[in-house]
Amino acid sequence: MSQNTLKVHDLNEDAEFDENGVEVFDEKALVEEEPSDNDLAEEELLSQGATQRVLDATQLYLGEIGYSPLLTAEEEVYFARRALRGDVASRRRMIESNLRLVVKIARRYGNRGLALLDLIEEGNLGLIRAVEKFDPERGFRFSTYATWWIRQTIERAIMNQTRTIRLPIHIVKELNVYLRTARELSHKLDHEPSAEEIAEQLDKPVDDVSRMLRLNERITSVDTPLGGDSEKALLDILADEKENGPEDTTQDDDMKQSIVKWLFELNAKQREVLARRFGLLGYEAATLEDVGREIGLTRERVRQIQVEGLRRLREILQTQGLNIEALFRK
């Protein structure tokens, strides 16, 4: 980009909230940073993405957004003013011209529990929010403002979606303070700090620290080995109170044959997507992203085809007096 890229200080612990619990944008948290060689190289790769005919969904997306030209400072102010007045075309232009900014920021959050396309999708929501609230008369560039919103939506998604049990955002932020303090103490003390040591460092009650740390305990997988010399997993010793008998198994086989017959009443694309998503016709059940990668479509397009296919299948099943929800669990 011709303008400076922007760096936003870590806002997880310092963010302020209004009376409705919505984070308040902090202009003081923004610092301009000259673009690095890596950033410039990444920009060049993104611009070349449109010419690469690769089936990988991420590369396809990068190619698509490569067609959108960047805005000059003057164009940015022009379109931002029109967007504030409700001009839909200007709003869309602001969004499309900054999609590469979202990709660059999303890549910094790799290996945090979410796939890159999911990070980009969350970041795009932040970009849309930034376009809706940006006031060009405030004196700073749009990328400054948008970076803050993009990072907030991505970080919140990581907090929410990478936990088996979701916690309120204010609890997650407080927990992060305790965990960061625990990491710092572990380096100083050469051992894992106790709740008492963390509480003393933060001047907090020990009971509060212990309660918060328990929220971070991991859920044990039923596939995890029991330990010792045993090769059995927890799942192997749990009784299945709902195990199907012979009659149920026969009914299930008949139902599977019927599902295959109904699938072939869909068009080829709908049939393939549903088969890959739900593990039918010899396929293993797969995520939207994995299906998109296999058949050369974006995650969003796969989702749309799935919705269309399920809608058509629902119509077919209704004529049989059946409910599709009993067949597919998403």
From Swiss-Prot:
Main location: cytoplasm
Keyword Zinc-finger among record annotations: no
Subunit structure: Interacts with the RNA polymerase core enzyme.
Name of this chain's protein: RNA polymerase sigma factor RpoS
Naturally occurring in which organism (per UniProt): Shigella flexneri
Family matches, as Gene3D superfamilies: RNA Polymerase Primary Sigma Factor, Winged helix-like DNA-binding domain superfamily/Winged helix DNA-binding domain
GO BP term, pick one: DNA-templated transcription initiation
GO MF annotation terms: DNA binding; sigma factor activity
Gene label: rpoS
Residue numbers spanned by region Sigma-70 factor domain-3: 174-249
Job of this protein: Sigma factors are initiation factors that promote the attachment of RNA polymerase to specific initiation sites and are then released. This sigma factor is the master transcriptional regulator of the stationary phase and the general stress response.
Membership in a protein family: Belongs to the sigma-70 factor family. RpoS subfamily.
Region (Sigma-70 factor domain-2): 94-164
